[in-house]
Amino acid sequence: MTKKEILDAIHGKMIISCQAVEGEPLYVEEKSIMYLMARAAKQAGTPAIRTSSIRDVIAIKEETGLPVIGLVKIQYPGYEGYITPTMKEVDDLVAAGSDVVALDCTLRKRGDGTTVNEFIAQIKEKYPDIILMADISNYEEGINAWKCGVDIVGTTMSGYTDYTSKKDGPDYELMERLAKDTDIPVIGEGK
């Protein structure tokens, strides 16, 4: 699918997240089982799946044929963010066939000394046709990511950073403001 086809397919629809990491009940070391969750989500009508590992990207794409928003959760020393924090994870997601790459676009410390703006520019230089989803926690980060050229903004980190942790539920105001002030899809996630 083209970038336009993917963005049109998800517009106004619910995207289902099918992910489990080590230590969670649905994580199985020997084999991904997230493709089964994705199968059910497809039957329920989701236009895309969000998932958090290379093996799940591959298994879900094979099972469903749906566009996949892929990410890798990994904590490196010196990095406050853990969602697709380095080019290694971006490379792995692209190689696995991820249709959209989600990455932490908060303005927190990056262990390699680059800014999130520099990281986005590096990704876009290496993969000019990539669809990027910025996982952000507040308005400033969303606007910054949009200005850097990401294709989708998600409120994924709202309520999960030191400076937004007082949120008890979804930040509907953040979603509304970003939808009004940007010209890209805004996906509501987070607490």
Where are these regions (language model features)?
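Glycine-enriched alpha-helix->loop->beta-strand junction motifs that scaffold or abut catalytic
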Residues: 45, 64-68, 96-100, 126-129, ...
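Catalytic cores of alpha/beta
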Residues: 78-96, 137-151, 184-191
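N-terminal amphipathic alpha-helix/helix-capping segment at the start of soluble metabolic enzymes
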Residues: 1-28, 61
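Conserved, mostly hydrophobic/aromatic
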Residues: 41, 60, 93, 145, ...
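Active-site-adjacent beta->alpha loops and helix N-cap segments on the catalytic face
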Residues: 2-3, 28-29, 50-69, 80-88, ...
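Glycine-rich phosphate-binding active-site loops on the catalytic face of alpha/beta enzymes
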Residues: 19-21, 43, 72-77, 96-110, ...
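Short beta-strand/loop segments at the ligand-binding rim of alpha/beta enzyme cores
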Residues: 11-16, 64-78, 124-137, 179-190
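Conserved beta-strand positions in the central sheet of alpha/beta enzyme cores
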Residues: 15, 48-50, 101-103, 133, ...
